[in-house]
């Protein structure tokens, strides 16, 4: 008899978990998603964690492992360059001393992360040669292993892959009963294992079980632009100092963003002020941009914890319910490894997660 695994949420964690579980013929997997406000669909999509200034070594190990999974998954599912491309990342610094320090950090971190690939210190002119769109380039450090990913397309491809095997998808909102019952529009549904990969919505979802998840929502907005010129598939992405990320996607699509808005709750309305701010940031890098080239403004809701670290695993008092949340703006980087670890746990019951996170009780508490 097949074991029933139900996943709530089809963002990066839910989709990757479903992908790995689809390889097990002894499992039947069902996924539910309301399809509103998902962070994965509205993310900037740079995979390049190695030069981060974050001091949390658990997070860094998780992000490094997540970045390393992408080539394997992309090859297995035969995704194209429009979904994922290891075109390299350029991180800029105006001050020569800061640039040298960044270059030194990159060389040090490559010793334990060979997937970083080639590392080069580039002049402003050399940066412009790599990214011809730039009209005001700054010197930077190039990491060839850096990549761009379209989070929406990536998750979609994984779900399509899993649907050909053991995945059934449902669109709709679900809720939990006080004992963890799964309640849908079609009534209560049974499961052997339930995975809550709902990001910022974990807190309200767990409240009926009298569990308070220490997560808060953060609004993120970005702009997509369609430019008249085209460029090669291997144009790097730019993480410019003091500005929004600048991401040339395949051919003529440019993404600028994203914002980090802590006071907007679950609001998904496009802000014209934020749109203007994002455009102004892009304009500082490419003076030829025009407002009418904006084709879309994307809005999503991320989940953050008080220490800006993700958490995942079984509920302390219910090993049949797994949760994952708090991925923040690096969710596309850490999400693949979290999804793989959750899938491994479902299949083996074993885990060794201490190297990646604090105890899950750090982020969950009983309601009064």
Predicted regions, residues:
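Beta1/beta-strand and adjacent pyrophosphate-binding region of the FAD-binding site
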Residues: 1-11
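Active-site substrate-recognition segment that forms the wall
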Residues: 6, 15-23, 45-46, 81-84, ...
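Glycine-rich FAD pyrophosphate-binding loop
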Residues: 22-42
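Dinucleotide-binding Rossmann-like beta1-alpha1 core, especially the glycine-rich loop
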Residues: 46-126, 130
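Helix-loop-beta segment of a Rossmann-like dinucleotide-binding subdomain
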Residues: 80-93, 108, 117-161, 259-263, ...
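A conserved short coil-to-beta-strand element within the FAD-binding core of flavoproteins
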Residues: 147, 168-182
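Core beta-strand elements of the Rossmann-like FAD/NAD(P) dinucleotide-binding domain
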Residues: 185-193
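C-terminal catalytic lobe of FAD-dependent flavoproteins
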Residues: 292-368
């Amino acid at each position: 008899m097949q074991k029933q695994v139900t996943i709530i949420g089809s963002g990066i964690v839910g989709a990757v978990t479903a992908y790995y579980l689809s390889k097990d013929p002894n499992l039947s997997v069902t996924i539910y998603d309301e399809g509103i406000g998902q962070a994965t669909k509205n993310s900037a999509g740079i995979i390049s964690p190695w030069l981060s200034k974050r001091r949390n070594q658990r997070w860094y190990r998780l992000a490094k492992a997540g970045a390393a999974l992408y080539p394997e998954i992309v090859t297995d599912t035969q995704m194209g360059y429009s979904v994922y491309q290891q075109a390299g990342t350029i991180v800029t610094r105006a001050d020569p001393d800061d640039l040298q320090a960044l270059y030194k950090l990159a060389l040090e971190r490559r010793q334990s992360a060979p997937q970083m690939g080639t590392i080069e210190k580039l002049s402003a002119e050399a940066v412009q040669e790599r990214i011809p769109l730039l009209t005001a380039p700054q010197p930077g450090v190039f990491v060839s292993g850096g990549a761009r990913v379209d989070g929406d397309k990536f998750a979609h491809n994984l779900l399509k892959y899993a649907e050909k095997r053991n995945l059934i998808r449902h669109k709709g909102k679900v809720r939990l009963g006080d004992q963890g019952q799964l309640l849908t529009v079609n009534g209560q549904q049974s499961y052997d294992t339930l995975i809550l990969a709902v990001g910022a919505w974990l807190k309200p979802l767990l409240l009926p079980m009298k569990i308070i998840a220490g997560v808060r929502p953060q609004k993120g907005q970005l702009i997509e632009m369609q430019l008249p010129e085209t460029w090669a598939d291997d144009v790097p992405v730019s993480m410019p100092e003091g500005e929004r990320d600048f991401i040339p996607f395949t051919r003529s699509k440019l993404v600028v963003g994203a914002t980090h808005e802590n006071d907007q709750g679950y609001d998904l309305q496009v802000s014209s002020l934020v749109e203007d701010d994002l455009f102004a940031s892009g304009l500082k890098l490419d003076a030829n941009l025009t407002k009418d080239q904006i084709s879309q403004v994307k809005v999503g809701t991320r989940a953050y914890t008080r220490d800006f670290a993700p958490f995942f695993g079984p509920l302390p008092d219910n090993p049949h319910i797994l949760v994952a949340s708090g991925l923040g703006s690096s969710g596309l980087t850490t999400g693949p490894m979290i999804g793989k670890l959750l899938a491994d746990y479902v299949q083996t019951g074993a885990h060794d997660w201490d190297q990646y996170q604090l105890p899950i009780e750090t982020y969950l508490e009983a309601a009064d």
